[in-house]
Amino acid sequence: MSERRERIPELDGLRVLMIFIVSWYHIWQQSWLRPMLGSYSLDYLVRSGYVWVDGTVLLSSFLLFLPYAQAMRDGAPPPDTRSFYFRRARRILPGYYFIILAVFFGIALPWKLYSSAPYMVKDLATHLTFTFPFFYDTYIATPLGAASWTLAIEVQAYALFPLVARGVMKRPAAVLCLLFAVCFGFRAWCVWGLTEYSMVVNQLLNFLDVYAVGMLAAMAFVRLRAHAGKASAGSLRKRLLPQALATVLFLLVFWALLRMLRFQATSKDYVEIQRRQMIFRPVFALCFTGLVLTAPFALLPLRKLLGNPVTRFLGGISMNYYLIHQTIIVHMKRLHLPPSVSDEPHMAGEQPWQTHYTLLAFGLSLLLAILVTYAVEKPAARLLDRWAKKRRPPAAAVPSGPVFPGPEEAPRP
Protein backbone atom coordinates (compact mmCIF):
# COMPACT_ATOMS: atom_id res chain seq x y z
CA MET A 1 0.00 0.00 0.00
CA SER A 2 1.51 3.31 -0.98
CA GLU A 3 1.43 6.06 1.61
CA ARG A 4 2.16 9.71 1.19
CA ARG A 5 4.36 11.04 3.94
CA GLU A 6 3.24 14.45 5.11
CA ARG A 7 5.56 17.11 6.42
CA ILE A 8 4.88 19.58 9.19
CA PRO A 9 7.52 22.25 8.51
CA GLU A 10 7.46 23.75 12.02
CA LEU A 11 8.60 20.45 13.50
CA ASP A 12 11.85 20.71 11.51
CA GLY A 13 12.77 23.68 13.66
CA LEU A 14 11.84 21.92 16.88
CA ARG A 15 13.90 18.87 15.90
CA VAL A 16 16.92 21.03 15.05
CA LEU A 17 16.61 22.92 18.35
CA MET A 18 16.42 19.69 20.34
CA ILE A 19 19.41 18.05 18.69
CA PHE A 20 21.44 21.26 18.80
CA ILE A 21 21.00 21.55 22.57
CA VAL A 22 21.81 17.87 23.15
CA SER A 23 25.01 18.20 21.11
CA TRP A 24 25.84 21.46 22.91
CA TYR A 25 25.58 19.55 26.19
CA HIS A 26 28.04 16.91 24.94
CA ILE A 27 30.45 19.56 23.67
CA TRP A 28 30.18 21.45 26.96
CA GLN A 29 31.14 18.25 28.81
CA GLN A 30 34.47 18.39 26.96
CA SER A 31 35.09 22.16 26.89
CA TRP A 32 33.53 23.42 30.13
CA LEU A 33 32.87 26.69 28.33
CA ARG A 34 30.28 28.62 30.31
CA PRO A 35 27.61 29.81 27.86
CA MET A 36 26.57 33.43 28.20
CA LEU A 37 24.10 35.56 26.27
CA GLY A 38 25.35 38.99 27.21
CA SER A 39 25.05 39.01 31.00
CA TYR A 40 22.48 36.18 31.00
CA SER A 41 23.89 32.76 31.83
CA LEU A 42 22.68 29.80 29.76
CA ASP A 43 24.54 27.40 32.02
CA TYR A 44 21.34 25.73 33.24
CA LEU A 45 20.19 25.14 29.66
CA VAL A 46 23.40 23.34 28.70
CA ARG A 47 23.77 21.43 31.98
CA SER A 48 20.30 19.96 31.47
CA GLY A 49 20.78 19.47 27.73
CA TYR A 50 20.33 15.69 27.96
CA VAL A 51 16.62 16.25 28.71
CA TRP A 52 16.01 17.28 25.10
CA VAL A 53 16.63 13.67 24.05
CA ASP A 54 13.18 12.99 25.52
CA GLY A 55 11.84 15.61 23.14
CA THR A 56 13.30 13.80 20.12
CA VAL A 57 11.74 10.53 21.31
CA LEU A 58 8.35 12.20 21.76
CA LEU A 59 8.61 13.83 18.33
CA SER A 60 9.44 10.45 16.80
CA SER A 61 6.44 8.80 18.44
CA PHE A 62 4.18 11.66 17.34
CA LEU A 63 5.26 11.46 13.70
CA LEU A 64 5.18 7.67 13.58
CA PHE A 65 1.67 7.50 14.98
CA LEU A 66 0.27 10.42 12.98
CA PRO A 67 -0.81 8.26 9.98
CA TYR A 68 -2.51 5.85 12.40
CA ALA A 69 -4.24 8.73 14.18
CA GLN A 70 -5.49 10.09 10.85
CA ALA A 71 -6.71 6.62 9.88
CA MET A 72 -8.57 6.39 13.21
CA ARG A 73 -10.33 9.69 12.54
CA ASP A 74 -11.15 8.81 8.92
CA GLY A 75 -12.24 5.25 9.66
CA ALA A 76 -9.55 4.04 7.25
CA PRO A 77 -7.38 0.90 7.50
CA PRO A 78 -4.03 1.18 9.31
CA PRO A 79 -0.87 1.98 7.34
CA ASP A 80 0.96 -0.92 5.74
CA THR A 81 3.40 -2.60 8.13
CA ARG A 82 5.91 -3.67 5.49
CA SER A 83 6.12 -0.11 4.19
CA PHE A 84 6.66 1.09 7.75
CA TYR A 85 9.65 -1.20 8.30
CA PHE A 86 11.11 -0.47 4.86
CA ARG A 87 10.99 3.30 5.42
CA ARG A 88 12.64 2.98 8.81
CA ALA A 89 15.42 0.74 7.47
CA ARG A 90 15.92 2.98 4.43
CA ARG A 91 16.28 6.06 6.61
CA ILE A 92 18.41 4.68 9.42
CA LEU A 93 20.58 1.73 8.45
CA PRO A 94 22.86 3.14 5.70
CA GLY A 95 24.09 6.14 7.68
CA TYR A 96 24.18 4.33 11.01
CA TYR A 97 26.14 1.33 9.76
CA PHE A 98 28.55 3.55 7.85
CA ILE A 99 29.26 5.68 10.93
CA ILE A 100 29.68 2.69 13.25
CA LEU A 101 32.04 0.91 10.85
CA ALA A 102 33.97 4.11 10.11
CA VAL A 103 34.52 4.75 13.81
CA PHE A 104 35.41 1.09 14.40
CA PHE A 105 38.01 0.87 11.63
CA GLY A 106 39.12 4.51 11.65
CA ILE A 107 39.34 5.24 15.39
CA ALA A 108 38.72 2.29 17.72
CA LEU A 109 41.15 -0.16 16.08
CA PRO A 110 44.00 2.22 15.16
CA TRP A 111 43.94 3.81 18.61
CA LYS A 112 43.68 0.41 20.36
CA LEU A 113 40.61 1.39 22.35
CA TYR A 114 39.59 -2.21 23.09
CA SER A 115 41.08 -4.07 26.06
CA SER A 116 40.51 -7.50 24.52
CA ALA A 117 39.39 -9.21 21.32
CA PRO A 118 36.20 -10.66 22.88
CA TYR A 119 35.16 -7.20 24.03
CA MET A 120 35.83 -5.82 20.54
CA VAL A 121 33.66 -8.49 18.91
CA LYS A 122 30.90 -8.02 21.48
CA ASP A 123 30.89 -4.25 21.08
CA LEU A 124 30.70 -4.35 17.30
CA ALA A 125 28.10 -7.15 17.21
CA THR A 126 25.80 -5.46 19.71
CA HIS A 127 26.05 -2.14 17.87
CA LEU A 128 25.18 -3.78 14.57
CA THR A 129 22.13 -5.40 16.20
CA PHE A 130 21.08 -2.38 18.32
CA THR A 131 21.38 -4.43 21.52
CA PHE A 132 24.35 -2.63 23.06
CA PRO A 133 22.30 -0.67 25.67
CA PHE A 134 21.71 -3.99 27.47
CA PHE A 135 25.37 -4.31 28.56
CA TYR A 136 27.47 -1.91 30.60
CA ASP A 137 30.67 -2.31 28.59
CA THR A 138 28.97 -1.78 25.22
CA TYR A 139 26.71 1.04 26.42
CA ILE A 140 28.60 3.13 28.97
CA ALA A 141 32.19 2.24 28.04
CA THR A 142 31.94 1.80 24.26
CA PRO A 143 34.43 3.63 22.02
CA LEU A 144 31.90 3.59 19.15
CA GLY A 145 29.99 6.66 20.26
CA ALA A 146 28.03 7.01 23.48
CA ALA A 147 25.22 9.03 21.87
CA SER A 148 24.05 6.21 19.59
CA TRP A 149 22.04 4.60 22.41
CA THR A 150 19.12 6.84 21.46
CA LEU A 151 18.87 5.28 18.03
CA ALA A 152 19.11 1.79 19.53
CA ILE A 153 16.12 2.55 21.76
CA GLU A 154 14.24 3.94 18.77
CA VAL A 155 14.94 0.82 16.68
CA GLN A 156 13.71 -1.39 19.52
CA ALA A 157 10.55 0.72 19.59
CA TYR A 158 10.18 0.50 15.81
CA ALA A 159 10.13 -3.29 16.03
CA LEU A 160 7.02 -3.13 18.24
CA PHE A 161 5.41 0.04 16.95
CA PRO A 162 3.06 -1.30 14.24
CA LEU A 163 1.65 -3.89 16.64
CA VAL A 164 1.18 -1.34 19.43
CA ALA A 165 -0.23 1.28 17.05
CA ARG A 166 -2.82 -1.13 15.68
CA GLY A 167 -3.76 -1.99 19.24
CA VAL A 168 -4.20 1.70 20.04
CA MET A 169 -6.42 2.10 16.97
CA LYS A 170 -8.71 -0.68 18.22
CA ARG A 171 -8.66 -0.02 21.97
CA PRO A 172 -6.89 3.29 22.62
CA ALA A 173 -7.68 3.66 26.32
CA ALA A 174 -6.74 0.10 27.25
CA VAL A 175 -3.48 -0.04 25.29
CA LEU A 176 -2.27 3.42 26.31
CA CYS A 177 -3.09 2.74 29.97
CA LEU A 178 -1.12 -0.50 29.69
CA LEU A 179 1.89 1.39 28.34
CA PHE A 180 1.70 3.88 31.20
CA ALA A 181 1.26 1.11 33.79
CA VAL A 182 4.25 -0.90 32.57
CA CYS A 183 6.42 2.20 32.39
CA PHE A 184 5.44 3.58 35.80
CA GLY A 185 5.81 0.16 37.41
CA PHE A 186 9.30 -0.27 36.00
CA ARG A 187 10.24 3.29 36.91
CA ALA A 188 8.99 2.90 40.48
CA TRP A 189 11.19 -0.17 40.86
CA CYS A 190 14.14 1.80 39.46
CA VAL A 191 13.67 4.85 41.68
CA TRP A 192 12.88 3.09 44.94
CA GLY A 193 14.56 -0.28 44.42
CA LEU A 194 17.94 0.79 43.05
CA THR A 195 20.68 3.14 44.17
CA GLU A 196 22.39 3.56 40.77
CA TYR A 197 20.46 4.21 37.58
CA SER A 198 22.93 4.35 34.68
CA MET A 199 21.77 1.05 33.17
CA VAL A 200 18.03 1.67 33.54
CA VAL A 201 17.33 5.38 33.06
CA ASN A 202 17.45 5.19 29.27
CA GLN A 203 16.06 1.73 28.57
CA LEU A 204 12.99 1.43 26.34
CA LEU A 205 10.73 0.50 29.27
CA ASN A 206 11.57 3.87 30.83
CA PHE A 207 10.41 5.68 27.68
CA LEU A 208 7.06 3.96 27.20
CA ASP A 209 5.20 6.89 28.74
CA VAL A 210 6.92 9.29 26.34
CA TYR A 211 5.84 7.13 23.40
CA ALA A 212 2.29 6.99 24.77
CA VAL A 213 2.16 10.77 25.18
CA GLY A 214 3.43 11.13 21.60
CA MET A 215 0.56 8.95 20.36
CA LEU A 216 -1.96 11.01 22.32
CA ALA A 217 -0.43 14.15 20.84
CA ALA A 218 -0.90 12.75 17.32
CA MET A 219 -4.57 12.06 18.03
CA ALA A 220 -5.00 15.58 19.36
CA PHE A 221 -3.18 17.04 16.37
CA VAL A 222 -5.50 15.54 13.74
CA ARG A 223 -8.46 17.06 15.59
CA LEU A 224 -6.79 20.44 15.91
CA ARG A 225 -5.84 20.39 12.25
CA ALA A 226 -9.41 19.62 11.22
CA HIS A 227 -10.66 22.49 13.39
CA ALA A 228 -8.01 24.85 11.98
CA GLY A 229 -9.06 23.88 8.47
CA LYS A 230 -12.63 24.96 9.19
CA ALA A 231 -11.47 28.20 10.81
CA SER A 232 -9.33 29.09 7.77
CA ALA A 233 -12.49 29.54 5.74
CA GLY A 234 -13.74 32.25 8.08
CA SER A 235 -12.92 35.93 8.45
CA LEU A 236 -9.43 37.28 9.09
CA ARG A 237 -10.28 37.76 12.76
CA LYS A 238 -11.44 34.17 13.10
CA ARG A 239 -8.21 32.98 11.49
CA LEU A 240 -5.84 35.16 13.50
CA LEU A 241 -7.39 34.67 16.92
CA PRO A 242 -6.60 30.92 17.17
CA GLN A 243 -3.12 31.58 15.76
CA ALA A 244 -2.47 34.26 18.36
CA LEU A 245 -3.70 31.93 21.10
CA ALA A 246 -1.43 29.14 19.83
CA THR A 247 1.53 31.53 19.81
CA VAL A 248 0.88 32.63 23.39
CA LEU A 249 0.52 29.01 24.49
CA PHE A 250 3.77 28.10 22.72
CA LEU A 251 5.63 30.85 24.57
CA LEU A 252 4.08 29.89 27.91
CA VAL A 253 4.97 26.22 27.44
CA PHE A 254 8.51 27.16 26.41
CA TRP A 255 8.84 29.31 29.54
CA ALA A 256 7.55 26.43 31.70
CA LEU A 257 10.04 24.08 30.04
CA LEU A 258 12.90 26.46 30.81
CA ARG A 259 11.78 26.61 34.45
CA MET A 260 11.80 22.82 34.63
CA LEU A 261 15.25 22.71 33.03
CA ARG A 262 16.55 25.23 35.55
CA PHE A 263 15.28 22.98 38.34
CA GLN A 264 16.82 19.90 36.72
CA ALA A 265 20.18 21.67 36.45
CA THR A 266 20.32 22.09 40.25
CA SER A 267 20.75 18.33 40.77
CA LYS A 268 23.69 17.85 43.10
CA ASP A 269 25.17 14.65 41.66
CA TYR A 270 24.78 12.12 38.85
CA VAL A 271 22.44 9.90 40.85
CA GLU A 272 20.07 12.78 41.56
CA ILE A 273 20.25 13.87 37.91
CA GLN A 274 19.01 10.48 36.75
CA ARG A 275 16.45 10.10 39.55
CA ARG A 276 14.89 13.45 38.70
CA GLN A 277 15.11 12.60 35.01
CA MET A 278 12.95 9.53 35.57
CA ILE A 279 10.52 11.11 38.03
CA PHE A 280 9.88 14.22 35.91
CA ARG A 281 10.05 12.57 32.50
CA PRO A 282 6.22 12.73 32.08
CA VAL A 283 6.28 16.45 32.90
CA PHE A 284 8.97 17.12 30.32
CA ALA A 285 7.01 15.01 27.82
CA LEU A 286 3.96 17.21 28.36
CA CYS A 287 6.07 20.34 27.85
CA PHE A 288 7.45 19.02 24.57
CA THR A 289 3.93 18.02 23.56
CA GLY A 290 2.78 21.58 24.13
CA LEU A 291 5.45 22.84 21.73
CA VAL A 292 4.58 20.23 19.10
CA LEU A 293 0.85 20.95 19.25
CA THR A 294 1.06 24.74 19.21
CA ALA A 295 3.89 25.51 16.77
CA PRO A 296 2.05 24.38 13.58
CA PHE A 297 -0.95 26.61 14.41
CA ALA A 298 0.93 29.72 15.58
CA LEU A 299 1.22 33.10 13.87
CA LEU A 300 3.18 33.19 10.63
CA PRO A 301 6.44 34.72 12.02
CA LEU A 302 6.86 31.89 14.53
CA ARG A 303 5.93 29.27 11.95
CA LYS A 304 8.47 30.67 9.50
CA LEU A 305 11.13 30.82 12.21
CA LEU A 306 10.69 27.11 12.85
CA GLY A 307 9.79 25.92 9.35
CA ASN A 308 12.01 27.28 6.57
CA PRO A 309 14.55 25.96 4.04
CA VAL A 310 17.40 26.17 6.57
CA THR A 311 15.63 24.16 9.26
CA ARG A 312 14.46 21.67 6.63
CA PHE A 313 18.05 21.14 5.47
CA LEU A 314 19.38 20.86 9.03
CA GLY A 315 16.54 18.51 9.94
CA GLY A 316 17.51 16.29 7.02
CA ILE A 317 21.06 15.83 8.31
CA SER A 318 20.15 15.86 12.00
CA MET A 319 20.23 12.09 12.53
CA ASN A 320 23.74 11.70 11.15
CA TYR A 321 24.85 14.83 13.01
CA TYR A 322 23.53 13.34 16.24
CA LEU A 323 25.20 9.98 15.63
CA ILE A 324 28.60 11.39 14.74
CA HIS A 325 29.09 14.46 16.92
CA GLN A 326 29.93 12.80 20.24
CA THR A 327 32.59 10.56 18.71
CA ILE A 328 34.14 13.50 16.87
CA ILE A 329 34.38 15.77 19.89
CA VAL A 330 36.02 13.09 22.03
CA HIS A 331 38.51 12.21 19.29
CA MET A 332 39.37 15.89 18.84
CA LYS A 333 40.75 15.86 22.39
CA ARG A 334 42.78 12.72 21.65
CA LEU A 335 44.29 14.57 18.70
CA HIS A 336 44.81 17.74 20.79
CA LEU A 337 42.72 19.62 18.28
CA PRO A 338 42.84 22.55 18.59
CA PRO A 339 46.26 22.78 20.31
CA SER A 340 46.29 23.88 23.94
CA VAL A 341 48.86 25.18 26.40
CA SER A 342 47.76 23.07 29.38
CA ASP A 343 47.22 19.31 29.48
CA GLU A 344 43.64 19.73 30.70
CA PRO A 345 42.53 22.99 29.04
CA HIS A 346 38.88 22.54 30.00
CA MET A 347 39.77 22.28 33.69
CA ALA A 348 42.15 25.23 33.45
CA GLY A 349 39.49 27.36 31.77
CA GLU A 350 41.98 28.03 28.99
CA GLN A 351 41.02 30.68 26.48
CA PRO A 352 40.81 30.91 23.55
CA TRP A 353 40.99 27.09 23.52
CA GLN A 354 37.50 26.62 25.00
CA THR A 355 35.88 28.86 22.40
CA HIS A 356 37.89 27.47 19.49
CA TYR A 357 37.19 23.88 20.56
CA THR A 358 33.45 24.55 20.84
CA LEU A 359 33.19 26.20 17.42
CA LEU A 360 35.37 23.55 15.75
CA ALA A 361 33.34 20.74 17.35
CA PHE A 362 30.09 22.14 15.98
CA GLY A 363 31.62 22.83 12.58
CA LEU A 364 33.31 19.45 12.06
CA SER A 365 30.25 17.55 13.24
CA LEU A 366 28.04 19.50 10.85
CA LEU A 367 30.40 19.02 7.91
CA LEU A 368 30.74 15.26 8.46
CA ALA A 369 26.98 14.91 8.89
CA ILE A 370 26.45 16.59 5.51
CA LEU A 371 28.99 14.26 3.89
CA VAL A 372 27.44 11.12 5.38
CA THR A 373 23.92 12.24 4.44
CA TYR A 374 24.64 13.13 0.82
CA ALA A 375 27.45 10.68 0.04
CA VAL A 376 26.11 7.62 1.87
CA GLU A 377 22.55 7.82 3.17
CA LYS A 378 20.76 9.34 0.18
CA PRO A 379 22.55 7.27 -2.52
CA ALA A 380 21.89 4.12 -0.46
CA ALA A 381 18.23 5.12 -0.12
CA ARG A 382 17.94 5.46 -3.90
CA LEU A 383 19.47 2.01 -4.36
CA LEU A 384 17.05 0.54 -1.84
CA ASP A 385 14.14 2.22 -3.62
CA ARG A 386 15.19 0.67 -6.92
CA TRP A 387 15.63 -2.72 -5.26
CA ALA A 388 12.17 -2.48 -3.69
CA LYS A 389 10.64 -1.44 -7.01
CA LYS A 390 12.09 -4.52 -8.72
CA ARG A 391 10.72 -6.80 -6.01
CA ARG A 392 7.26 -5.24 -6.16
CA PRO A 393 4.81 -7.62 -7.86
CA PRO A 394 3.40 -6.37 -11.18
CA ALA A 395 -0.05 -4.84 -11.11
CA ALA A 396 -2.83 -7.27 -11.89
CA ALA A 397 -4.36 -7.06 -15.35
CA VAL A 398 -7.63 -5.17 -15.53
CA PRO A 399 -10.45 -7.58 -16.47
CA SER A 400 -12.44 -6.80 -19.59
CA GLY A 401 -15.87 -7.37 -18.08
CA PRO A 402 -17.54 -5.99 -14.97
CA VAL A 403 -16.44 -7.59 -11.74
CA PHE A 404 -18.54 -7.51 -8.60
CA PRO A 405 -16.29 -7.96 -5.55
CA GLY A 406 -17.25 -10.21 -2.72
CA PRO A 407 -17.42 -8.86 0.83
CA GLU A 408 -13.75 -9.61 1.52
CA GLU A 409 -12.75 -7.79 -1.70
CA ALA A 410 -14.91 -4.72 -1.26
CA PRO A 411 -12.96 -1.50 -1.50
CA ARG A 412 -12.15 0.02 1.86
CA PRO A 413 -12.69 3.71 2.57
Q: Where are the regions a protein language model picked out?
A:
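Membrane-cytosol interface segments of multi-pass membrane proteins
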Residues: 1-188, 192-195, 207, 230-232, ...
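Alpha-helical transmembrane segments of multi-pass integral membrane proteins
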Residues: 22, 211, 215, 246-378
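Interfacial loop-to-helix junctions that mark the boundaries of transmembrane helices
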Residues: 45, 201, 236-240, 275-278, ...
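Membrane-water interface of transmembrane alpha-helices
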Residues: 63-70, 221-223, 294-295
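Cytosolic, membrane-interface loops and tails of multi-pass inner-membrane proteins
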Residues: 79-80, 220, 227-228, 302
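Signature aromatic-anchored transmembrane alpha helix within multi-pass, membrane-resident enzymes
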Residues: 180, 235-253
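Acidic, glycine-rich loop-and-beta core segments that form the ion-binding/anion-interacting portion
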Residues: 198-200, 204-222
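Flexible interhelical linker loops that connect adjacent transmembrane helices
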Residues: 226-237
